[in-house]
């Protein structure tokens, strides 16, 4: 259970990082 939640959290963080990078590229 704990590991599943951790992996889910990691996945969401990586998704946020990707979206942030996309926005950064769009701004520039």
From Swiss-Prot:
It is found in: Secreted; Cytoplasm. GO terms for molecular function: receptor antagonist activity. Highly expressed in testis. Also expressed in kidney, heart, skeletal muscles and brain. InterPro entries: Humanin. Induction: Expression is not affected following staurosporine (STS) treatment. Down-regulated 6 hours following beta-carotene treatment, remains down-regulated 24 hours following beta-carotene treatment. Keywords: Cytoplasm, Secreted. One of its GO terms (cellular component) is extracellular region. Disulfide bonds: none annotated. Plays a role as a neuroprotective and antiapoptotic factor. Belongs to the humanin family. This is Humanin-like 4. It comes from Homo sapiens (Human). The lineage of its organism: Eukaryota, Metazoa, Chordata, Craniata, Vertebrata. The gene is MTRNR2L4.
